[in-house]
């Protein structure tokens, strides 16, 4: 017998024995290759090119350099990443933030989000340049700088990663743990700021980046999740529950640790300002920006509730 194109057995001139040298096209195993004793059928191997750390760093740097050249060619603003040439720059509508708390933000960004106008984390860096800095995952030198900045605060529990994995602590339980340092007020005598790390990427990539941060810092970076009933105003709705954008996550964390409601509202308003620019700049692609589906790629994935426009 032989297998036809549909995987069924058909008559063979050579007799009734299965052809052991030809695999069925639909991926099924021939009878003599079927797993026995309830064993699972082996998965088809995916062949993906693996880069060395140096090759990956060079690849990411080339991607970032190409994006920077494209930004200049298209007339995009280097601060808000919107098209300034066509009048969509939002910098004039962004109010500088003044924090009561002495906090620093590390925006660990995937190169796919870097220089993407729809990304919201860049707005935080634009309005608080002294308190927020963008680091690109995989770019040469960024990991070394990141490690140098965070190792001390991690050792003193003055640092956390907003990341809602299974082992993440709540904000209350993190600060209630022995040795945890409270978020100091700006200008306090101690003079040691508190660091908040956020991963700016799609959920699949964010998990990989979070694991990389754990390796970089020897597992010393605590993971913390938020508990809130506020829903997202982010421009792109999510395919899964538990998603709001980076700026909203930071705003809600700050409110939980004592920042003012006024600053919270200003940060949410920044996301809305970014949304309005997207609605004009990408009017032809609006369906893509607002569609919800299993392949939607954006970094708004922080919470466990249904995501919709508006704030409750």
Task: Say what each PLM segment does.
Residues 1, 8-11:
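N-terminal chloroplast transit peptides
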Residues 16-23, 28-34, 39-45:
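Intrinsically disordered, low-complexity repeat/linker tracts enriched for polar/charged residues
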Residues 51-71:
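Short Cys/His-rich Zn2+-coordinating modules
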Residues 67-68, 83-156, 181-186:
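Glycine-rich, flexible N-terminal cofactor/catalytic loop recognition
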Residues 77-80:
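Short cysteine-rich clusters marking metal-coordination/redox-active sites
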Residues 111-112, 139, 166-167, 226-231:
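Short, acidic/turn-prone active-site loops that include or flank metal/cofactor-
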Residues 127-215:
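S-adenosyl-L-methionine/SAH cofactor-binding core of RNA-modifying enzymes
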Residues 189, 195-196, 201-312:
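C-terminal folded domains that constitute the principal catalytic or ligand-binding module
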């Amino acid at each position: 017998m032989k297998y036809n194109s549909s995987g069924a057995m058909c008559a063979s001139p050579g007799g009734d024995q299965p052809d052991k040298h030809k695999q069925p096209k639909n991926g099924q195993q021939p009878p003599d290759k079927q797993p026995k004793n309830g064993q699972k059928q082996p998965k088809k191997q995916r062949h993906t090119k693996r880069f060395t750390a140096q090759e990956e760093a060079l690849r990411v740097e080339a991607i970032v350099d190409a994006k920077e050249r494209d930004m200049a060619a298209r007339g995009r603003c280097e601060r808000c990443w919107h098209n300034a040439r066509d009048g969509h720059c939002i910098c004039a509508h962004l109010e500088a933030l003044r924090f009561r708390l002495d906090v620093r933000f590390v925006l660990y960004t995937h190169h796919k989000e870097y220089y993407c106008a729809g990304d919201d984390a860049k707005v935080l860096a634009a309005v608080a340049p002294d308190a927020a800095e963008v680091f690109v995952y995989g770019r040469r030198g960024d990991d070394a700088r990141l490690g140098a900045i965070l190792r001390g605060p991690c050792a003193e529990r003055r640092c956390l990663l907003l990341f809602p994995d299974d082992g993440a602590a709540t904000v209350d339980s993190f600060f209630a743990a022995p040795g945890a340092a409270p978020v100091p007020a700006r200008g306090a005598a101690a003079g040691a700021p508190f660091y908040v790390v956020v991963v700016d990427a799609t959920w699949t990539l964010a998990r990989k980046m979070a694991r990389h941060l754990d390796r970089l810092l020897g597992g010393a970076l605590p993971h913390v999740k938020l508990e809130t009933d506020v829903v997202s105003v982010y421009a792109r709705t999510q395919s899964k529950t538990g998603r709001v954008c980076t700026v909203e996550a930071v705003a809600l964390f700050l409110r939980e640790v004592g920042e003012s409601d006024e600053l919270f509202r200003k940060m949410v308003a920044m996301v809305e300002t970014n949304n309005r620019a997207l609605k004009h700049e990408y009017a032809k692609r609006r369906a893509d920006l607002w569609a919800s589906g299993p392949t939607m790629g954006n970094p708004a994935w922080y919470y466990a509730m249904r995501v919709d426009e508006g704030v409750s």
